[in-house]
């Protein structure tokens, strides 16, 4: 069970770096078995978990749910349902205590 945290300060430089991580790069590094190239396309991917979640040109859109984003941070919060601090911790590999 995830625990609720109170205010956590995140260094602005760390936050800027985290926001720059695109979803395709994140999946290639941390969830390669979840990344699937869409047949018949040159640069469109989806996830094994959600075939209607398409990734292309630095952005992603989950067609069956009607929302999308640009970064891995957006994906972890909107799709994987991590809170903001948990998502930052995943992307940095550090605890933000």
Annotated model-derived regions:
Residues 1-97:
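N-terminal structured subdomain of primase-like DNA metabolism proteins
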């Amino acid at each position: 069970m995830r625990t609720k945290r109170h205010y956590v300060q995140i260094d602005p430089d760390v936050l800027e770096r985290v926001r720059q991580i695109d979803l395709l790069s994140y999946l290639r590094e941390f969830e390669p078995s979840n990344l699937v190239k869409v047949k018949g396309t040159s640069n469109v991917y989806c996830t094994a978990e959600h075939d209607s979640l398409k990734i292309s040109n630095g952005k992603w859109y989950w067609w069956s749910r009607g929302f999308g984003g640009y970064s891995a941070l957006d994906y972890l919060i909107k799709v994987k349902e991590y809170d903001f601090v948990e998502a930052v911790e995943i992307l940095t590999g550090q605890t933000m205590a």
